[in-house]
Amino acid sequence: MNLNSIPAFDDNYIWVLNDEAGRCLIVDPGDAEPVLNAIAANNWQPEAIFLTHHHHDHVGGVKELVEKFPQIVVYGPQETQDKGTTQVVKDGETAFVLGHEFSVIATPGHTLGHICYFSKPYLFCGDTLFSGGCGRLFEGTASQMYQSLKKLSALPDDTLVCCAHEYTLSNMEFALSILPHDLSINDYYRKVKELRAKNQITQPVILKNERQINVFLRTEHIDLINVINEETLLQQPDERFAWLRSKKDRF
């Protein structure tokens, strides 16, 4: 299996997995044109589309892709049923694509119906988890997003986290504002800054490393608790997450 990223819009990534036979899986195609170009250039044969949620920058290219390749099966949560989904999937179910089983994980927060797909080592997490950050709470609650991130953080160490946006640099700038002396955060920030200066992608990321540098996955760590306690005493990790998310929204 080969993992490919296709840039779209200002900062989206459309992920494509292909096998040796050229069959491919497309994840969150917000725009059809760059996907069609990649299909033609690589002689891929699209077999399926995974949708994580209903936002237009993740589903906008579905109609055109299905018109061009009517054999495509489109998997997605209930909230994408009017966006071209032909196979609705929910938490705990599996999608069998390219000879692999992908587990469906419900991750409400960014939207209420958001889902992720996992087949070791690949995690397609849409707008739930970003490198160094997490998605905004457009529909769900902070508590829901906290629980969703806990689910993803519990996946195997070697999981390849495939995020849908290139937000890493700004996320790490925020992380530094919270934990300015953290060595892991400082090291990763320098690496990301160098990559982005060369217009290079910062993804996918390894989950084991992400747990060390993503403040939203560290709400139970004493260093972060101490920082938060300087402003307000919060007993529960989901409350600390809500505090962080609110800070990031204003950053």
Swiss-Prot record:
Cofactor: binding comment: Binds 2 Zn(2+) ions per subunit.
InterPro entries: Clx_II_MBL, Glyoxalase_II_hydrolase, HAGH_C, Hydroxyacylglutathione_Hdrlase, Metallo-B-lactamas, RibonucZ/Hydroxyglut_hydro
Pfam families the UniProt entry points to: HAGH_C (PF16123), Lactamase_B (PF00753)
Required cofactor(s): Zn(2+)
Gene Ontology MF terms in the entry: hydroxyacylglutathione hydrolase activity; metal ion binding
Enzyme Commission no: 3.1.2.6
Family from the record: Belongs to the metallo-beta-lactamase superfamily. Glyoxalase II family.
UniProt name for this protein: Hydroxyacylglutathione hydrolase
Origin species: Shigella dysenteriae serotype 1 (strain Sd197)
